[in-house]
Amino acid sequence: MKTIFHIDVNSAFLSWSAVKRLKEDPNALDLRTVPSVVGGDRKTRHGIVTAKSIPAKKFGIKTADTVASAIQRCPDLIVIPADFTTYREYSRAFIKILKSYTDKVEQVSIDEAYLDATNLGDPIELAERIKAEIRDTLGFTVNVGISSNKLLAKMASDFSKPDKIHTLFIEEVPDKMWPLPIGELHGCGKKTSEKLQRFGISTIGDAASTSLEVLQSILGEKGGEYIFNGSRGNSSDKVHTEHEEAKSYSNETTLPHDITPDNYEAEMAQVLKWLSEKVSARLKKDGVFAKTIDVQVKTNTFHRRSIQTKLPDATNEADLIFKTATGLIEKLLLGENGVFRTETGIRLVGVGATDLDNGEYKQLDLFSYQKEQEEAKLEKKAQKEKEDKLNAMADKIKGKFGEGAISRGFSR
C-alpha cells in the first residue's frame, strides 16, 4: 500500500501577500490576523474574493463572494489586489522544498501538490518535518493530508485548518468522511450537490450507499461513476512526476472556485499565464519545441472540452504559448458554440503543448542558411576576381590594338 500526501498552502494568496509585506517591513500588520481578503478594489468594490483570512471567515465571507458583499458583512475588511508575481515566486519555493524530500511530486495547482511518501519513513514524522521546514523557511503554513490514495489525501488536507496534519485511510472513511455533507466530497460541485440532495442524497455516506445505476441516472455516466467511486474512497494512487511525460507537455489546475462568465475577465488570464509559464519551463528544461498548443477545461458538471491549434513555427516561449492559449480559450468558452452557452462554470483549466521536436530542424535551417551565405560570398568573390582578370586582359588588348578591338557582347 502506498503512502500519499496532499500538501495545501493555507489561504495561499493571502498568506503569500502577508509574508511579502512582513519581509519588506517586519512591523507591518500581518494580514492573516485580521479580517482581510485578496481580490479586487475596495474603493470600487469590484472583484471576487479569491482568498480570505480566518478572521474574515468568521464573518461568513467565502471564496468567490463579491468584494461588495464581503464588505457588507465586514465594513472594516481589508481588501488587497492579487499579486501573481509574488504568488509564482512562493509557489516555486514551496515546490522546491517538497522536491528536496523526493522527486515523486505532482503539482496540481499553484498552491497544492501530491507527494508519494511510500518508503520514506514514518508518515506523521515526515509530514511534521515538511510542514515545519516550509513554515520556518518561507514563513507560511500548510496542511498535510495523508492516505493511501490521492482523493483521500486531498479530503484529509481539507479537514480543520491551518497548520494541521490529518489522516484519512480507507478504514477511517466511515467515521471521518461519510458523515460529511455531499458537497464536501472533492470534485462534487454546487450544482452536482444540489442535484443529489433533491434525490435525498445529503451526505457522502448517502452516496456511498447508493447504487452506481441510480447515481448515473441522476448525474450521467461520468458524473455518477465519479461520485460512486469517490464516496467509497476509491481513487488513483499514482503521483505523476513531470519527467514521466514524453510525447506531450501539459499542466492543469483545479481552481479554488469556478470561473464563470461573471469573473472570466478578472481571473482567467492569470490562470493561463501561470500554466503557460509552467509548460514553457518544462519544454526549455528538456530542450524541446512544440508546434501545437491546446487548452482543456472541465466544467462543474464534469464535462471536458478542448481545443487546439498548430503554430507556424515550433516554440517553447511562455509569451507565445500564453497568447495562443488565450485565443483558444476565448473561442472555446465564448465562441459561437462556446461552453458558456450551456455550462455555468469551469472548475479545471489546462494548457498543453504537443507535436514536439528537439530543435534539430531549427538548427539545420540556421546552418543551411549560414552555409548558403558563405557559398554566396565565395561565389561573388570568385566572380569578381574573374571579372578583374578579364578587365585587365581587355585593357592590354585595347592598349595594343586600340579601343575598337573589344566590345560588349549581347544575346538576342
Task: Please provide the spans of the model-predicted regions.
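Gly/Gly-Pro- and Ser/Thr-rich, intrinsically disordered tail segments characteristic of DNA damage-repair
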Residues: M1-N229, A281, E374-R412
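DNA-contacting surface of Y-family translesion DNA polymerases
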Residues: E184, E194-E343, Y361
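Short, internal active-site loops enriched in acidic
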Residues: N119-G121, N149-A153, G233, K298-F302, ...
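Short Gly/Ser/Thr- and Asp/Glu-enriched loop/turn motifs at secondary-structure junctions
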Residues: V108-E112, S147-K150, E244, V288-T292, ...
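Acidic, metal-coordinating catalytic segment for phosphate/diphosphate chemistry
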Residues: W16, L311-R412
